[in-house]
Amino acid sequence: MSLEIVPFVVAIPARFSASRLPGKPLRLLGGRPLIHRVAERALSAGAREVWVATDDVRIAEAVASLDGVHVAMTANTHLSGSDRLAECARIAGWDPEMCVVNLQGDEPFAPAAGIRAVAALLHHSNADMATLATTIDKSEDLFNPNIVKLVCNAHGEALYFSRAPIPWNRDTFATTPEPTPLGPWLRHIGLYACNAGFLQRFTTMQPGTLEQIESLEQLRVLEAGHRIAVRITPEHFPPGIDTPEDLARAEKALEDV
């Protein structure tokens, strides 16, 4: 599959009241707000436009100092980041066919090539949404509920996403305390692409039981019968920042560069 550059915009959902790391977008990483570093990754990927969608004036004010980054002030009632981005798309006035890359606000090390790749994957697939995955090679990642796992069908489309270790190896996991994950285990990367029109359709879908149990908004798409294309990327995506421990790890990684 050719993954040449296709036109796309990037939208970054950002909320202040993250339960595991309150004020996350404004937490400092290397002396700068986390949201700054994420937005700059989007700019480096060559997006036509970069928007931060937030309901918090503190985040909006922090982003205002970044050249080339727009802010969409959204409602504080959205159930998910994708719901927030649907409002952002209306504010920005994007064409329904415009490819929108949803870059999570906790991905300060997202490689530019990976951002471009997910846009190209959507362009070349017949799926409603596209995302990326990478292989898991550490047992602590496989069993970490903050690291989302996924399984795919033979056509490279997502079957399910879970915080649990899927697929479950019945013969190994039940008997080995810390098995080495040699096999088909994949870590989901919090990066999505869909067109602006599908974002609006997303808002009409009711959150299903699976989404509510796992607290994973992408399951709403699968539960509604839509398809998500998945590419196993060679690009290195460090895990996102969800907890104070993740932030400390990212700080150390930045110091080691």
Swiss-Prot record:
Catalytic activity line of the entry: 3-deoxy-alpha-D-manno-oct-2-ulosonate + CTP = CMP-3-deoxy-beta-D-manno-octulosonate + diphosphate
Alphabetical keyword list: Cytoplasm, Lipopolysaccharide biosynthesis, Nucleotidyltransferase, Transferase
Broadest EC class assigned to this enzyme: transferase
A biological-process GO annotation: lipopolysaccharide biosynthetic process
Pathway annotation: Nucleotide-sugar biosynthesis; CMP-3-deoxy-D-manno-octulosonate biosynthesis; CMP-3-deoxy-D-manno-octulosonate from 3-deoxy-D-manno-octulosonate and CTP: step 1/1; Bacterial outer membrane biogenesis; lipopolysaccharide biosynthesis
Domain of life: Bacteria
Family indicated by similarity: Belongs to the KdsB family.
Name of this chain's protein: 3-deoxy-manno-octulosonate cytidylyltransferase
